[in-house]
């Protein structure tokens, strides 16, 4: 978070921003964009980062729009002498890191909850499909080797759900190890999501790759 190279230099009642911001989700349709810029100290210092609200049609702001792998839209931004009023600072000068740190923890929890919900749908849909798909005169859900794979899907999902509840409670309570719990959740959700998704595709056979 502290590796910020975009710079903001004071210019009277404004700041002049120069730099780059990548992967701005929903950037193509955004009217305003939050930019983190360094207003003091060195590149990797946690202090000296300030958040600015920037109009997307500001002079000197250029967008490169593209689709993401999940079908959403994103933008990469280039800022060249973009003038922003001091009134557009979020919080106070040089305090952006604390705001970002808190917001990202909440974002990880929210996205993880979405992912855990997707895992549940994948697992349950796969179980139901194997009850109706037949091979060799019986439903494939009765094949022990496939049952083992679905048990693994269930266990990965349940572990992630438990981690999600635990990390969320620690965050809300302000527990000293909340960040550790959130980091563990982020890792496990990514690992389990990939595993459950792959198993769902494979157990659906040809249906798993049919649009």
Which functions belong to the PLM regions below?
Residues 25, 44, 67-71, 104-114:
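Short alpha-helix boundary/capping segments
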Residues 3, 55-91:
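Flexible, small-/acidic-enriched active-site or ligand-binding loops
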Residues 18-62:
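A short core secondary-structure module
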């Amino acid at each position: 978070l502290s590796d910020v190279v975009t710079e903001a230099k004071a210019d009277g009642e404004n700041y002049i921003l120069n730099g780059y911001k990548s992967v701005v989700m929903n950037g193509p349709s955004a009217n305003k964009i939050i930019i983190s810029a360094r207003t003091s100290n060195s590149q990797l210092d946690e202090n000296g980062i300030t958040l600015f609200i920037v109009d997307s049609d500001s002079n000197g702001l250029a967008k490169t729009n593209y689709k993401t792998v999940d079908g959403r839209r994103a933008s990469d931004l280039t800022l060249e002498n973009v003038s922003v009023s001091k009134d557009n600072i979020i919080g106070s000068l040089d305090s952006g890191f604390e705001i970002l740190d808190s917001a990202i923890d909440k974002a990880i929890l929210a996205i993880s909850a979405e992912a855990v919900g997707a895992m549940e749908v994948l697992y349950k849909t796969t179980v139901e499909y194997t009850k109706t798909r037949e091979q060799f005169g019986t439903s494939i859900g009765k094949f022990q080797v496939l049952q083992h794979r679905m048990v693994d899907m269930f266990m990965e999902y349940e572990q992630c759900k438990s981690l999600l509840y635990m990390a969320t409670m620690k965050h809300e309570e302000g527990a000293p190890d909340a960040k550790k719990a959130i980091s563990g959740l982020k890792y496990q959700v990514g690992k389990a999501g990939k595993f459950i998704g792959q198993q769902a595709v494979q157990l659906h056979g040809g249906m798993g790759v049919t649009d």
